[in-house]
UniProtKB/Swiss-Prot annotation:
CDD domains, per database record: PBP2_Lpqw
GO annotation, cellular component aspect: extracellular region; membrane
Region forming the signal peptide: 1-26
Natural source organism: Mycobacterium tuberculosis (strain ATCC 25618 / H37Rv)
UniProt name for this protein: Probable monoacyl phosphatidylinositol tetramannoside-binding protein LpqW
Role summary: May directly or indirectly regulate the accessibility of the key branch point intermediate, monoacyl phosphatidylinositol tetramannoside (AcPIM4), to the elongating alpha-1,6 mannosyltransferases which could regulate the lipoarabinomannans (LAMs) biosynthesis.
Pfam families: SBP_bac_5
Pathway the protein contributes to: Phospholipid metabolism; phosphatidylinositol metabolism
Gene Ontology terms, MF aspect: peptide transmembrane transporter activity
Lineage: Bacteria, Bacillati, Actinomycetota, Actinomycetes, Mycobacteriales
Keyword Lipid biosynthesis: yes
């Protein structure tokens, strides 16, 4: 090996020093920051929307329809839904010190004020809140008041319209936000008018209109809740909080009314917490099942409807009071009431002509029940031949109609025959086809009459046909159906028994001058002891082709002029209603036109998961009057 030269040794040494210096410098140099990384800007994720509080209420079925002003639509569910989704000028508050158990207070969410502003003529001015609107954003206005008045006066089969019959005009002021209502006379019960106001701009244009357009729908509403869906097949009604409501919002977001099913199924549903509130028909066993569930509150309450059997005394065969009395005497009211109630151990019999069992001053005034022998004796005294031989005869025929549904059935075994001049006494009982309870009661009544020899049939009709064409054409001799309970007694008396309620008088048209109607004109009073007077044979036709005609509301077809002054005095407040009832009640029984049967009664229950449910509300609205305040716990 050679020895390295000096030059090479120097180069190696210098290189080593340079390398060492670089390493030292590298160790002292600050490291550069890492390259920036691409990252997403953090965002706050909003929480999911809170599910609306849903309360489920068990019911029997959704009912025949949703117009609260029609006799054929009266039902507990309709009363409840209407109170929750429709605006009212005044609302009922429980008060046992009043004749009907309710006092009526102004609804401040709809009205700014409602006052009597003139006594000559009697005038009430309603000031509507500017923000009050329907769910389609249309304003709630005086036009809606005008429309309801016109319909209540001109449509047949409405609920006790005597108060509306006194109105002579409804004026719209302040851009529709003020309704000035003028009456023909003072009317102390004016606060009970304009409840459950309907959206005129919708109802007048939907198919069927006021009379049948709301049979399965409430497309536009104006209350704390709106109708989300109606499912007749499943018997369900879904109502939801009305987001356009201008007043305090409801606490429940959703209330689902649904069919409860059999008593055992309802008890299981309440026990498991699937159903929180219930209002159903049922007997003592169903009530006991619900009452036995821990922390479940139960009660029995009456609903705002009573069932009656009404004879049409203007029909020639029923013109004789004794014949009517005999027919009503042949009916077993206890059995009819059991059929109407759906049970035989929880029946609330109605045994008065004017007051209902729910009225604080109610006492039974019905005369003692008549025996069948006594009833048949009255028929014999009226010229009928009573044959008690058992025979088989075909079911009696009824007038032909394309709109009828007749329960004729197979030939009946008749234990007798009641006839006059060789013709058997017939009786066609009309009933609304959409009301299965009334149909069942009517069929039972027909069975009882056929059993003694009266050829009775049931004619189930569309409600519009029943209360208009069938009455005008005398196609029915009697009617079985519901009447309202819990309303003003003087109005009830005038609507159902008054002589003016038989007349077809004119109503001012939309643009016609509003003048007070003339006194009703009727035939000369009869000399018969009961002073019963039939209506004119034909309605008077209006001279103005644009005028409307009042629809008679007295379904009996006659009136007693000897008590008309008392009826008028009760209506205008110059006589105490209690004194008037004492005076006229015996006369109404003597007329033998109306047989009260029962007041509808239901079981109500509230589970522990819902607070603020009152089981004793005002009769017209039931337990849902405060549903906007129901609170579901645990949410």
């Amino acid at each position: 090996m050679g020895v390295p030269s000096p030059v090479r040794r120097v180069c190696v040494t210098v290189g080593a020093l340079v390398a060492l210096a670089c390493m030292v410098l590298a160790g002292c140099t600050v490291s550069p920051p890492p390259a920036p990384q691409s990252t997403d800007t953090p965002r706050s994720t909003p929480p999911p929307p809170r599910r609306p509080t849903q309360i489920i209420m068990g019911i029997d079925w959704i009912g025949p329809g949703f117009n609260p002003h029609l006799l054929s639509d009266l039902s507990p569910v309709n009363a409840a839904i209407s109170a929750l989704v429709l605006p009212s000028a005044f609302r009922p508050i429980p008060d046992p010190n009043t004749p009907t158990g309710s006092r009526w207070e102004m609804d401040p969410t709809l009205l700014v004020s409602a006052d009597v502003t003139n006594n000559h003529p009697f005038t009430v001015t309603y000031k509507i809140r500017p923000e009050a609107q329907w769910t389609d954003n249309a304003p709630i206005a005086a036009d809606d008041f005008w429309y309801l008045w016109q319909q209540m006066v001109t449509q047949p089969g409405v609920v006790d319209p005597a108060g509306y019959h006194l109105i002579t005009s409804v004026q719209s002021l302040e851009g529709g936000k003020q309704a000035v209502v003028t009456f023909a006379q003072p009317y102390p019960a004016w606060r009970e008018l304009f409840t459950d106001i309907l959206p005129a701009h919708i109802v007048k244009d939907i198919p069927g209109g006021f009379a049948s357009g709301l049979a399965r729908a409430l497309p536009v509403t104006g209350g704390q809740f709106r109708v989300e869906n109606i499912d007749p097949q499943r018997d369900e009604i879904l109502i939801a909080r009305n987001d356009r409501y201008w007043g305090p919002p409801s606490k429940p977001g959703i209330i689902l009314f649904r069919r409860a099913g059999a008593p055992a199924a309802l008890a299981d549903s309440v026990r498991n917490g699937d159903t929180q509130v219930a209002q159903v028909h049922g007997g003592s066993a169903a009530f006991a099942q619900l009452s036995a569930i821990p922390d479940v509150r139960t009660a029995r309450i009456v609903t705002p409807r009573v069932m009656q059997f009404t004879l049409r005394a203007n029909v020639p065969k029923l013109a004789d009071t004794q014949v009517r009395k005999a027919i009503l005497g042949l009916l077993d009211v206890d059995l009819l009431a059991a059929v109407g109630a759906g049970t035989d151990n929880t029946v609330t019999l109605d045994q008065a002509q004017i007051r209902s069992p729910s009225d604080p001053g109610y006492v039974p005034t019905a005369p003692p029940a008549m025996s069948s022998a006594a009833a048949l004796g009255l028929l014999e005294a009226s010229g009928f031949q009573v044959d008690t031989n058992t025979s088989v005869s075909p079911a009696p025929s009824v007038p032909d109609s394309t709109t009828t549904s007749v329960s004729t059935g197979p030939p009946e075994v008749i234990r007798g025959r009641i006839s006059k001049d060789g013709e058997q006494l017939t009786l066609v009982i009309g009933v609304a086809a959409n009301d299965p309870t009334s149909v069942a009661v009517a069929n039972t009544a027909a069975d009882q009459l056929r059993d003694v020899g009266i050829a009775a049939t049931v004619l189930a009709l569309d409600p519009v046909t029943l209360y208009h064409d069938a009455l005008n054409d005398n196609r029915v001799d009697a009617i079985v159906g519901w009447r309202q309970a819990g309303g003003n007694l003087a109005t009830l008396l005038a609507s159902r028994y008054g002589c003016p309620a038989l007349q077809a008088t004119t109503v001012p048209a939309a643009n016609a001058p509003t003048t007070a109607p003339s006194a009703p004109i009727g035939p000369t009073p009869s000399a018969a002891p009961d002073t019963a007077t039939p209506p004119p044979t034909a309605p008077r036709r209006p001279s103005d082709p644009g005028a409307l005609v009042k629809a008679p509301s007295n379904l009996t077809g006659i009136c007693d002029r000897s008590i008309q002054s008392n009826i008028d005095a009760a209506l205008n407040g110059t006589k105490n209603i209690n004194d008037v009832i004492t005076a006229v009640e015996p006369r109404l029984w003597n007329m033998s036109t109306v047989l009260p049967i029962l007041q509808d009664t239901t079981i109500v229950a509230a589970g522990p998961s819902v607070q603020n449910v009152s089981l004793s509300g005002a009769v017209p609205v039931g337990i849902v009057g405060d549903a906007g305040q129901w609170v579901k716990t645990g949410q």
